């Protein structure tokens, strides 16, 4: 099964920049997006063969997530069941026969780490949410997790040590998540790969210079490592300041057939 995740940085804009070309060519079983920046009814996306699940932020033009799935799930949930966290449309969970698919757009800690205390609470609550799912079935988590875990995951680690996305605190929370029984699928296949990123600032010709960050992930329950077949980052795909990331599993992960 093929999973794709992409922070589209505004879906309406991305649709004008080739979103559907990539969507159709990649032919994913599950296609997850973050930062849709939409409210209900603002786009009519024709995706034959896919079920669409949307989570919108209360604030207009902000955040938002969606999952497009070929197979209808057993159940769908929006958010993580904590009102403080669930106003910004950041999480969707689909339940299938023997796994959960979760897409997430993690809150940014913002300039001068102004939102770091909230981010820390989010990290703890979201990790507990994932662990509770994992106690029932394996989890496939994807999305913009807004952290470059290690120095190898961004171009300029030394100058970004105290910036949002590479603070010691955020990195430690990712370490804690992975230590709770989860795998960073890209590093599972490519533990030493350098210069492969998923986000580039629009400033300073960052993408042209490949001055990027790897902050978009597929994180899976460690006990299904043997079912992972592939991880990829589609750095050549334009349309957003992020590029799509991919994971492929052997079909031991079954989607419910309808």
Residue ranges: model-predicted function:
Residues 81-82, 107-123, 160-162:
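Surface-exposed cleft-lining segments at the edges of enzyme active sites
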Residues 51, 125-211, 215:
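Metal-dependent phosphoesterases centered on the DNase I-like endonuclease/exonuclease/phosphatase
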Residues 1-9, 98-110, 142:
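Active-site-proximal beta-strand elements of phosphoester/diester hydrolases
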Residues 251-258:
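Conserved small/polar residues in nucleotide/adenosyl-binding loops
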Residues 7, 23-41, 101, 130-151, ...:
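Active-site beta-strand/loop signature of hydrolases that rely on acidic residues for catalysis
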